[in-house]
Regions:
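C-terminal ends and interior cores of transmembrane alpha-helices
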Residues: 1-6, 196-209
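Hydrophobic core of transmembrane alpha-helices in multi-pass small-molecule transporters
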Residues: 9-26, 212-227
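Cytoplasmic helix-loop-helix junction between adjacent transmembrane helices
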Residues: 15-52
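Intracellular juxtamembrane helix-capping segments at the cytosolic ends
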Residues: 25-39, 225-240
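A gly/Pro-rich, aromatic-decorated transmembrane alpha-helix motif that marks the paired
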Residues: 29, 50-71, 247-249, 255-274, ...
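Helix-loop-helix hairpin linking two adjacent transmembrane segments in secondary transporters
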Residues: 46-101
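Extracytoplasmic gate region of multi-pass secondary transporters
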Residues: 119-165, 169
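Helix-to-loop junctions at the C-terminal end of transmembrane segments
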Residues: 174-186, 268
């Protein structure tokens, strides 16, 4: 809200940085908490479900934000509404007697656990892959509307609807379906198929335009859906018993989301083509496919 009054780009960047810090703290605390709220054997199922519900926010966010930001409404209103909603949720949670997750950890410490070393090279490759995924996803999300306006020739408000119901809707459905499919098929193979899908879809986005590119974007979001939790879990398998340290390091890879948009924006400004900028996500998906292909089945 102060940023809308000051009307400074750098103040808006600072505001977004503060929001990002809050979201990072929420992500790092909510995911471990979800693992201890219930039977330990169902921990992975709970995390997948909680991450799948992110898709609902990704649908509502672009829908509401696009309609407000591109309709001439004061830019402070969307952020004020989000702030009020978050404060309301925080107030509700503060009144709920939530179980203490430390009790579960205390119970675990009474059992002897065999120390297993971290496979540093394999885990490092997993970190790099997750870094590139976050970079690709953020780049695609950041420039979808710009690309749609330039190459698909649709208005920004219409593009925001396509992003909300088409892209994010398929992302949500894909993550739910992927959680079920992985009960029958190795996660590595599911990741490989999705990497191939996203690579081909991004290639179409680069070389084509119009309706075909829009369809490719939808396929791209569908393929992206299972990547983050799958890469995260595969990388953790190389962490041995250093899962807490490994989880913290993996969370740090979200900084990739700050890298790709800058590079893609520079390419678009330099070449005058938003489509060429999507070569960056194309390379990222290629590396993800290589990671899934070369990942030893024995480590799954």
């Amino acid at each position: 809200i102060p940023g809308s009054r000051i009307n400074s780009f750098y103040f808006f960047v600072l505001s977004l940085f503060v929001i990002g810090c809050g979201l990072t703290c929420l992500e790092t605390s909510a995911n471990p908490y979800a693992t201890v709220l219930g039977h330990p054997d169902k921990a992975e199922s709970r995390i997948n479900l909680s991450q799948s519900l992110n898709g609902i926010g990704w649908i509502v966010g672009p829908l509401v934000g696009g309609q407000l930001l591109f309709s001439g409404v004061n830019i402070a209103i969307p952020y004020a509404l989000v702030g009020i909603f978050v404060l309301a949720v925080a107030l509700v949670l503060s009144r709920i007697n939530l179980p203490d997750p430390r009790r579960a950890h205390e119970a675990d410490t009474n059992e002897m656990v065999e120390e297993k070393p971290m496979r540093v090279m394999a885990f490092g490759l997993g970190m790099l892959t997750l870094f590139l995924y976050v970079a690709a996803q953020t780049g695609v999300n950041s420039f979808f509307i710009n690309y749609a306006e330039e190459s698909i020739h649709i208005e920004k408000q219409t593009a925001s609807l396509y992003l909300a119901f088409g892209g994010m809707g398929l992302f949500f459905i894909g993550r739910l379906a992927g959680g079920v499919i992985m009960n029958y098929i190795q996660p590595r193979l599911v990741l490989l198929v999705c990497a191939i899908l996203t690579f081909v879809a991004t290639l179409i986005v680069v070389v084509c335009s119009g309706t075909l590119s829009l369809i490719a974007f939808f396929a791209l979001y569908l393929g992206e859906s299972i990547m983050f939790p799958t890469i995260f879990s595969l990388a953790l398998r190389d962490a041995g018993t250093k899962t807490k340290l490994a989880s913290s390091l993996l969370i740090m890879t979200i900084v990739g989301g700050a890298v790709a948009p800058v590079i893609m924006g520079y390419i678009a400004d330099t070449t005058g083509s938003m489509a060429i900028a999507f070569l960056i996500p194309l390379v990222c998906y290629g590396v993800i496919g290589g990671y899934a292909l070369l990942k030893p089945s024995a480590s799954l």
